[in-house]
Protein backbone atom coordinates (compact mmCIF):
# COMPACT_ATOMS: atom_id res chain seq x y z
CA UNK A 1 0.00 0.00 0.00
CA UNK A 2 1.63 3.19 -1.16
CA UNK A 3 1.16 6.26 0.98
CA UNK A 4 1.94 9.77 -0.19
CA UNK A 5 2.17 12.66 2.29
CA UNK A 6 -0.05 10.88 4.83
CA UNK A 7 -2.83 10.29 2.30
CA UNK A 8 -4.52 6.92 2.45
CA UNK A 9 -5.05 4.81 -0.65
CA UNK A 10 -8.59 4.50 -1.97
CA UNK A 11 -10.48 1.39 -0.90
CA UNK A 12 -13.04 -0.71 -2.77
CA UNK A 13 -15.66 -0.44 -0.04
CA UNK A 14 -17.92 2.61 0.09
CA UNK A 15 -18.41 2.08 3.84
CA UNK A 16 -14.68 1.84 4.53
CA UNK A 17 -14.00 4.90 2.38
CA UNK A 18 -16.79 6.79 4.16
CA UNK A 19 -15.22 5.88 7.51
CA UNK A 20 -11.82 7.06 6.28
CA UNK A 21 -13.40 10.37 5.25
CA UNK A 22 -14.29 11.08 8.90
CA UNK A 23 -11.44 13.31 10.14
CA UNK A 24 -10.93 11.60 13.52
CA UNK A 25 -10.73 8.14 11.95
CA UNK A 26 -8.52 9.35 9.11
CA UNK A 27 -6.11 11.01 11.52
CA UNK A 28 -6.09 7.91 13.72
CA UNK A 29 -5.22 5.66 10.78
CA UNK A 30 -2.50 8.04 9.60
CA UNK A 31 -1.05 8.21 13.12
CA UNK A 32 -1.09 4.40 13.34
CA UNK A 33 0.66 4.09 9.98
CA UNK A 34 3.31 6.62 11.02
CA UNK A 35 3.94 4.93 14.38
CA UNK A 36 6.84 2.40 14.36
CA UNK A 37 4.67 -0.26 16.03
CA UNK A 38 1.88 0.43 13.55
CA UNK A 39 4.27 0.11 10.61
CA UNK A 40 5.55 -3.19 11.97
CA UNK A 41 2.00 -4.48 12.53
CA UNK A 42 1.03 -3.55 8.99
CA UNK A 43 4.16 -5.21 7.60
CA UNK A 44 3.45 -8.43 9.54
CA UNK A 45 -0.20 -8.40 8.47
CA UNK A 46 0.73 -7.82 4.83
CA UNK A 47 3.32 -10.59 5.00
CA UNK A 48 0.77 -13.00 6.49
CA UNK A 49 -1.73 -12.04 3.78
CA UNK A 50 0.83 -12.59 1.00
CA UNK A 51 1.90 -15.93 2.50
CA UNK A 52 -1.42 -17.46 3.48
CA UNK A 53 -4.37 -15.67 1.87
CA UNK A 54 -3.09 -14.57 -1.55
CA UNK A 55 -2.45 -18.15 -2.77
CA UNK A 56 -6.04 -19.09 -1.86
CA UNK A 57 -7.72 -16.23 -3.75
CA UNK A 58 -8.11 -18.14 -7.05
CA UNK A 59 -9.94 -20.92 -5.21
CA UNK A 60 -12.29 -18.43 -3.56
CA UNK A 61 -13.25 -16.64 -6.79
CA UNK A 62 -16.29 -18.81 -7.50
CA UNK A 63 -17.80 -18.64 -3.98
CA UNK A 64 -17.10 -14.91 -3.96
CA UNK A 65 -19.18 -14.59 -7.13
CA UNK A 66 -22.18 -15.88 -5.17
CA UNK A 67 -21.49 -13.70 -2.15
CA UNK A 68 -20.61 -10.49 -4.01
CA UNK A 69 -24.21 -9.13 -4.39
CA UNK A 70 -24.83 -9.59 -0.67
CA UNK A 71 -21.53 -7.97 0.24
CA UNK A 72 -22.26 -5.03 -2.08
CA UNK A 73 -25.73 -4.61 -0.54
CA UNK A 74 -24.23 -4.69 2.98
CA UNK A 75 -21.62 -2.15 1.88
CA UNK A 76 -24.32 0.15 0.48
CA UNK A 77 -26.36 -0.16 3.70
CA UNK A 78 -23.27 0.63 5.76
CA UNK A 79 -22.59 3.72 3.65
CA UNK A 80 -26.21 4.89 3.98
CA UNK A 81 -26.09 4.32 7.74
CA UNK A 82 -22.92 6.41 8.05
CA UNK A 83 -24.57 9.18 6.02
CA UNK A 84 -27.54 9.20 8.41
CA UNK A 85 -25.23 9.17 11.43
CA UNK A 86 -23.41 12.20 9.99
CA UNK A 87 -26.75 13.99 9.54
CA UNK A 88 -27.79 13.31 13.14
CA UNK A 89 -24.35 13.84 14.69
CA UNK A 90 -22.64 16.48 12.53
CA UNK A 91 -19.87 16.93 15.09
CA UNK A 92 -18.08 13.83 13.72
CA UNK A 93 -17.22 15.76 10.56
CA UNK A 94 -15.32 18.43 12.51
CA UNK A 95 -11.52 18.46 12.31
CA UNK A 96 -9.71 16.42 14.93
CA UNK A 97 -7.95 19.44 16.42
CA UNK A 98 -11.28 21.20 16.97
CA UNK A 99 -12.78 18.13 18.67
CA UNK A 100 -9.67 17.77 20.83
CA UNK A 101 -9.81 21.41 21.90
CA UNK A 102 -13.52 21.14 22.70
CA UNK A 103 -13.05 17.98 24.75
CA UNK A 104 -10.12 19.53 26.57
CA UNK A 105 -12.25 22.57 27.42
CA UNK A 106 -15.12 20.41 28.68
CA UNK A 107 -12.80 18.31 30.83
CA UNK A 108 -11.09 21.39 32.27
CA UNK A 109 -14.38 23.23 32.95
CA UNK A 110 -15.03 21.81 36.45
CA UNK A 111 -11.44 22.46 37.50
CA UNK A 112 -11.47 25.99 36.12
CA UNK A 113 -14.86 26.70 37.69
CA UNK A 114 -13.66 25.34 41.03
CA UNK A 115 -10.60 27.57 41.02
CA UNK A 116 -12.68 30.60 40.05
CA UNK A 117 -15.15 29.86 42.86
CA UNK A 118 -12.32 29.41 45.38
CA UNK A 119 -10.74 32.69 44.29
CA UNK A 120 -14.10 34.47 44.56
CA UNK A 121 -14.70 33.15 48.09
CA UNK A 122 -11.21 34.16 49.24
CA UNK A 123 -11.61 37.60 47.66
CA UNK A 124 -14.99 38.05 49.36
CA UNK A 125 -13.49 36.92 52.68
CA UNK A 126 -10.62 39.40 52.34
CA UNK A 127 -13.08 42.23 51.61
CA UNK A 128 -15.28 41.29 54.57
CA UNK A 129 -12.27 40.99 56.89
CA UNK A 130 -11.16 44.45 55.77
CA UNK A 131 -14.69 45.87 56.41
CA UNK A 132 -14.89 44.38 59.90
CA UNK A 133 -11.38 45.53 60.76
CA UNK A 134 -9.10 44.20 63.43
CA UNK A 135 -6.94 41.13 63.68
CA UNK A 136 -8.54 38.87 66.28
CA UNK A 137 -10.65 35.73 66.41
CA UNK A 138 -13.97 37.57 66.66
CA UNK A 139 -13.33 39.67 63.54
CA UNK A 140 -12.26 36.56 61.64
CA UNK A 141 -15.49 34.86 62.74
CA UNK A 142 -17.59 37.84 61.63
CA UNK A 143 -15.80 37.86 58.27
CA UNK A 144 -16.42 34.13 57.82
CA UNK A 145 -20.13 34.45 58.68
CA UNK A 146 -20.64 37.42 56.35
CA UNK A 147 -18.67 35.66 53.57
CA UNK A 148 -20.90 32.60 54.00
CA UNK A 149 -24.05 34.71 53.84
CA UNK A 150 -22.86 36.63 50.77
CA UNK A 151 -21.77 33.48 48.95
CA UNK A 152 -25.03 31.69 49.82
CA UNK A 153 -27.11 34.63 48.58
CA UNK A 154 -25.10 34.70 45.33
CA UNK A 155 -25.72 30.98 44.82
CA UNK A 156 -29.45 31.38 45.50
CA UNK A 157 -29.65 34.27 43.02
CA UNK A 158 -27.78 32.21 40.41
CA UNK A 159 -30.08 29.19 40.91
CA UNK A 160 -33.10 31.50 40.63
CA UNK A 161 -31.79 32.94 37.37
CA UNK A 162 -31.20 29.46 35.94
CA UNK A 163 -34.66 28.30 36.99
CA UNK A 164 -36.25 31.44 35.52
CA UNK A 165 -34.43 30.88 32.23
CA UNK A 166 -35.49 27.22 32.12
CA UNK A 167 -39.07 28.18 32.97
CA UNK A 168 -39.16 30.64 30.06
CA UNK A 169 -37.60 28.04 27.80
CA UNK A 170 -40.23 25.46 28.85
CA UNK A 171 -43.03 27.98 28.20
CA UNK A 172 -41.70 28.58 24.70
CA UNK A 173 -41.58 24.84 24.00
CA UNK A 174 -45.11 24.32 25.33
CA UNK A 175 -46.44 27.25 23.28
CA UNK A 176 -44.70 25.90 20.20
CA UNK A 177 -46.20 22.43 20.72
CA UNK A 178 -49.68 23.83 21.39
CA UNK A 179 -49.61 26.10 18.33
CA UNK A 180 -48.43 23.33 15.98
From Swiss-Prot:
Role this protein plays: Lipid droplet coating protein that regulates lipid metabolism, appressorial turgor pressure, and virulence. Mature appressoria with high turgor pressure are essential to penetrate the leaf surface.
Name used for this protein in its record: Lipid droplet coating protein Cap20
Similarity field: Belongs to the perilipin family.
Keywords: Lipid droplet
Annotated TM spans: none
Intracellular or extracellular location(s): Lipid droplet
Triggers of expression: Expression is positively regulated by the cAMP-dependent protein kinase catalytic subunit PkaC1.
Keyword Transcription: no
Keyword match Ligase: no
SUBUNIT field: Interacts with class I hydrophobin Hydr1. Interacts also with the cAMP-dependent protein kinase catalytic subunit PkaC1.
Effect of disrupting the coding gene: Reduces the cellular lipids content in both mycelia and conidia. Decreases the virulence on rubber tree leaves.
Amino acid sequence: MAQVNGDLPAVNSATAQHLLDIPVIHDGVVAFRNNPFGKKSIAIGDSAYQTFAAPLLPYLARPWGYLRPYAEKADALGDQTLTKVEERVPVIKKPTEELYAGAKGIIALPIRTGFEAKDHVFKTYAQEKKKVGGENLVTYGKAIVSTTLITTSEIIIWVGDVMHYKKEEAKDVVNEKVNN
